[in-house]
Amino acid sequence: MSEIRRILLDDKVEVVERFGDLLKTEDGRKVLIENAVHLPPCEPTKIIAIHLNYDSRTKEFLTKLPLAPTYFHKPITALNSHNGDVVRPKRCKWLNYEGEIVIVIGKTCKDISIADAHKYIAGYSIGNDFGLHDFRDTDAGSMLRVKGADSLAPVGPGLVTDWDFHNKFIRTYVNGVLKQEDNTKNMEWDMHYLVADIARTITLSPGDIIFSGTPANSRPVNIGDVVEVEVEGLGRLTNRIVEGHSIREEVGAQPTESEEVVSTALGGDWEFRGIRTPSKDLYPSTVKERNDHN
């Protein structure tokens, strides 16, 4: 296996290879990892993510996996890097981490078999599919603002080639405390299946990335929290939560705190209980209403 990273060095983008605690450029320059300014390890034209894949996640929501994977799209502007700041806007409070393994496409592919999918994968990285659930009442179907806001797709620190994804652990930590833990053997659809499935109808280009799903226990984070995702053989992706500007109030849907929002953010069973997005005319907060009656 080898690990390739992209860093900013002397105001230029450099592709470097990792050797222990050092990163080495093609012309022989060396940089300590701790001093490197990391960029995302690839330059995708598409960021695609699966909704559900781990058995623990479906059990947490008291739901069942669909018969086949379902996906959503994250804008390129959501892309972030190792040690990058993840922004939670003012007036928002339900920003969740979701530690994941990321597939990086190496060659253009379309309409390929599962057996051939590995030929089109450049390697693997670590991702954190952050979700701003304050907008779930508005964009639950498309996930556009829930998962697509700027900075909500950290990937890194590097791209590892020839990594065997079978029976590997994945863990997420917040401020050093373990929050998520699972194993790739508990994924319903493996990496090769996901690539072949998407490529049936969508051309995948070099650098494109696919988030492969998160296990149970995705939870909200607070300003100042440090979130780390660790994957066996891939390393550790680190990000800090910072506060952004306030969401404009004179235009568009506003952050909400409905029971669906809170239940999703806290790993609840809103779908099992038949709760649906509240009226788009009122966007009532059933959580607030319930608290007012207590």
Question: Which stretches of residues belong to each language-model region?
Answer:
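Short catalytic-site patches enriched in acidic/histidine residues
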Residues: 70-87, 110, 151-157, 216-219
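Catalytic-pocket segment enriched in acidic/His residues
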Residues: 19, 57, 133-294
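Short, conserved beta-strand element in jelly-roll/cupin
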Residues: 72, 102-107, 155, 195-196
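Extended, compositionally biased flexible segments
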Residues: 2-93, 97, 256, 262, ...
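Residue-level recognition of short, solvent-exposed, well-ordered loop/turn junctions
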Residues: 49, 96-98, 205, 222-223
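RNA pseudouridine synthases
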Residues: 98-128
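Short hydrophobic-aromatic micro-motifs
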Residues: 6, 47-50, 101-105, 123-126, ...
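A generic local secondary-structure boundary/capping motif
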Residues: 37-39, 60-62, 86-95, 109-116, ...
